[in-house]
Every structure is written in structure tokens, then in C-alpha cells.
């Protein structure tokens, strides 16, 4: 971590001492700078160190010992890691190579020997005993594929090798089948199955597919040294846990250096802080703040290191934690930075901190705002629901709504049957009830949705609601245009109390006869015109009435009873509008369903079952409208209503 600050210094001395660096691990990272001049000299030595019996040669960059290696490697990796981030530019300059500068150039040109570690690449080798073959197998993972190499004859699993290249199965198998020397393994662990080919052929394939560097150190001759070297054991052979721990230790540095490079390599001291922030910010808007944070943080870099250590790994997984913590920390640090460096950038850093905190903790921080915002919409939606309960709660009022708006909505319903069925004159008498269902079929969906609030058998209620608002709407509609609306309203009011007092069930069937006389007459006169008038307003009113009439789910039914309770159903001008005789089926349904319909309005089982059946049979509420002979149904309904009357 401390090296991070001297990191630039480290590079400079190493650059100056690069010629001497080969022996010292740190110089290797910098060796790329000076080595370009002496690539040939350094390469043999470093290779010896790397791959020679001296494992230190390879860890060459890690000579300082594992703990120090991490910083050293981190500094090198920092050079390397940033290079990985900015690999195009960084790699273009040898800096990427932690190994000899000459090799770095070779690696950039592409190493065909497999002996040179690509820039920033660490040897990661594991070994397992292949009991069936009686040999150790060295395993290197690349692109999620484990490629194995035998220790005794150094053959390599060509199948897995070509899988790393992303080769198709057919092409891979064709190439492997053409190999003269091959060993097919069909039994054993998955990573050992496949066609094994000689080391030289495997290297040729790797070079041809340009995956040699990705497979490093699979082709290193003394791969065992990499495996068994203590530093490498802790880093590579030990496994993911060790690597994860090492990464955690290195991450503050490497991440800091990376972001430092990205943000601005000028302040090597700051990395800790803005890494801390930049990492957290990286979650939200990583790059935006680091530049600002870098300058302010340099002075406060150390303190931030602690936080950086605590935060660096979490940010991604604990973005919410990071966001919250970072918000606080970013604010604090920004404030501190402001005090320390009241530069123009610091306010930016503060702002960025805020914005980053916002963006970073999007989950925690923004969720409350999101929740609030959503709460507002939810509130509105709830209020909408509230409107539904209101409709359902005060059925009498719903009847009023039905009287007023249902008339409007009724128009559209009537308009549909009217246009379809025809004689508007008769519409006034019976059709309404038949049509209510038809309209239910037509309109109910919207109403149902609106009316959905009534909990009991939403389908039924909704369906009923749709019919009810339609009935109510239709009835009041006719009344409104005729001016009978007054009497209708009176009837409606009477009906609505009666209906509400009596079963909300509807005045649809039963109430219709009771109040139908007035309403029917009114319907007869007014219904045709209102129906025609209704369509334009019906859509609007349906929207309106859906909440009012449909939401009335219960109230809507009351409203049906109230405004059109008897008159609507009796007059349910659907049959007249649709056709005089449309009531036939409807009448039957009404007879059977009048009880049913009130029930359905109430969400009773019979109504619910019937409506459910209709819903199952076809679109919700459209079942009536969908009936092949809506006119007949309405006629039946009219006949039944008339008979009852």
C-alpha cells in the first residue's frame, strides 16, 4: 500500500537501474522501460530466474517475499493492472511486462514459445494425480476451460486446448483425428477426457489459434517450479481462496492504481482514497469522481486507505453498503478534501461524491426515493383503489353514479347493441338487461378492471360490475336524454336504496321489474337516442363510470338497481336496441340469472359460476356479447323481464 505512493518513484529508480534490475523483483516491473535497450541481455537472465531451478527467477517480480511481493507485485501489477485496463497504450510500452523488458516486447509481438509470461500474467498452475495413467497432471485454466498437461510425457489435452480457442466441435474433432500421435481418453475426470497430443503439436495449435499467452504457463518447460515455488503456491497452486485473499490485499493498490491511471496517474498518493471512492463510485459513476477525488484525496490518501481496504472488495457485492457507507465517507472525505484542498475540483468531487453516492447506493439510497416516488404513484393508484372501495362502500352513491355516468357508459353499450341489433325503439323496453350482459361482454373488461376492487369473485364481480355499470349507465343514460332521468333518478334513488337495502344483487333482474315500469317507459322513449348519443360519451363515461359504476361493483349493482334497477333491466334497451326479440335467451338467463345476476352482482356463487363459465367460454364479459345470437338472448331477456313484470 505504501509503495503505491512511491510507485512512481519505484518506477523511476527502476527505470534508472533497470539494467541492474534483473536481480531485484521490483525492477522487473520497470524493466520494460530500460530493457528496451537491452532486451537480449535481460531475457536470458530473467528467463533463468523465472524458469530456472530458482523459482525466485519467475517470482523475480516477487523476490521480496510473498507479503512484500504483493506490494511489489501490486506496484508492478499496478503498472500491469492499469496496463490491463489501459492495455492498448500501456502494453504498447513495455511497462506491462512484469518480466524482462525484452520479453515484454516479445509478448507484445506475441510469444510463440509459451515460456514468457504475458504482461500482468501470474502463473496459476494446479496439479492432480491421474491415477489411471499413473502420472501427475498440471492444469492451467483459460477462459473457464481447464487444460491439462502430463508430467511424464508432457502430452497435452488437445480437446480442451482447442476449446479454449473457441473452435467448433466438428473442426476440433477433425483436427484431432488427423493427428498421428494422439492418445484418446474416454474415462476419467472431465478435464482429462479427450484427445491428448504431443507437447510440440499442442504448442503449434496454441500459436496458430493465438492462445499461447492465455494458456501460460501451460507450455513453460519447468512448469513444476512454478507449481511448487512457495510464492506461487500461495498465489496460484493453493487455489482460488489464496488468490482471492491476495487479490483482496492487492486490490486496494491495484484498483487504486488502475483508477488512478484512469483518473489521472499524477497523484499516486491519493489512490487509496479515490480508489476507495472510485471503487465505490465505480459502482455508480466510478470514473467521474476519481479525477476530482484524486486531487483532494492525495493529502488524505492514507486515511482513505483504511476505508479503501474495508470497502474495496465490497463495492460491487455490497454496493448498497458501499453506497451508504460511501455516501457518508465520500461526503466526509470530500469535506476533508475541500478543507485540505479547496481546489475547484473538490467541489466537483463533493458533487461527484453526492452524485456517486446517489448512483452507487442506487439500491439503498435511491430505493427510498424510488419508494417515495413509487409511493406517490402507488398512492395515486391506491387512491384509485380507494375510489373503488368508495364505490363499493356507498352503493347508493354508486347508484347515483350509475344514474349519471352509467348513463354515459350505458350509451356506448347501447350504441353497440343498438347499431348491431337495430330497432332503437324497442331498446327502451327489455334489451337493457340482455344488453347489459352484451355490454358486459363489450365493455366489462374496462369496467371489470376498474371494478376489480370488489374482492368477492373478482371475475364475477368484475363481470357483474361491467354489466352493472352498463345496466346502470344505460338506464340512467336513457333517463338523462329523455329527461325522465329525473323520475329515473327518483326511481333510481328509490331503487338504489331499495336495491342497496335489498340485495345489491341487482336490481338487475328483480329490481328491474320493481322499478322497471317507470324506467322502462323512460327507456323506451329515451333509450334509443341516448344510446346513439352514448357512444361518444360512453367511452369517456365508461372510463368514468368504470371507476364509478364498475367500482361500484357492489354499488354499481346498486346503481343498476337504483337508476336502471328495474327500468334498466326491464328496459335494458339492449334488446330493443339490438333487436326486439333479442330477449329470448336473455329472458331465460334473466329468469334463471336474475337471481343469478343479483348474485353475480354481489359476487354470489351462482352468478360467479355462471359468469365464470361465460368467462371460460370466451372473453370476460364478452360471453354475452359473444353469443352467436345476442339478439335472441336479449329478446329472451326482454321476454323474461316482461313476463316477470
Curated annotation (Swiss-Prot):
Q: Where is the composition biased (Low complexity)?
A: 18-52, 317-330, 469-481
**Origin: domain of life:** Eukaryota
Segments of skewed composition (Basic and acidic residues): 586-597
Under SMART domains, the record lists:
KilA-N
* Ranges where the record places region Nuclear localization domain: 585-613
- Which of UniProt's keywords are assigned here? Conidiation, DNA-binding, Nucleus, Sporulation, Transcription, Transcription regulation
Q: What induces it?
A: Expression is induced during mycelial growth and at 14 days after infection, corresponding to the development of pycnidia on oilseed rape leaves.
Q: Which residues bind DNA?
A: 158-179
Record Pfam families: KilA-N
Q: Summarize the record's disruption phenotype note.
A: Alters growth in axenic culture and impairs conidia production and perithecia formation. Abolishes the pathogenicity on oilseed rape leaves and results in a drastic decrease in expression of at least the three effector genes AvrLm1, AvrLm6 and AvrLm4-7, during infection.
Q: Where is the composition biased (Polar residues)?
A: 254-271, 279-288, 336-365, 502-542, 569-584
Q: Function of this protein?
A: Transcription factor that regulates asexual reproduction. Binds the StuA-response elements (StRE) with the consensus sequence 5'-(A/T)CGCG(T/A)N(A/C)-3' at the promoters of target genes. Regulates the expression of several effector genes (AvrLm1, AvrLm6 and AvrLm4-7) during infection stage.
The similarity annotation says: Belongs to the EFG1/PHD1/stuA family.
> For the HTH APSES-type domain, which residue ranges apply?
124-230
* GO MF entries: DNA-binding transcription factor activity; sequence-specific DNA binding
Where would you find this protein in the cell?
Answer: Nucleus
**Protein's gene:** stuA
Does the keyword Transcription regulation belong to this entry? yes
Q: Which GO terms describe its biological process?
A: conidium formation; positive regulation of transcription by RNA polymerase II; sporulation resulting in formation of a cellular spore
**What is the name listed in the Swiss-Prot or TrEMBL entry for this protein?**
Cell pattern formation-associated protein stuA
Principal location class: nucleus
Region of interest (Disordered), ranges: 1-52, 246-645
Q: Which InterPro entries match?
A: EFG1/Phd1/StuA, HTH_APSES_sf, KilA/APSES_HTH, Tscrpt_reg_HTH_APSES-type
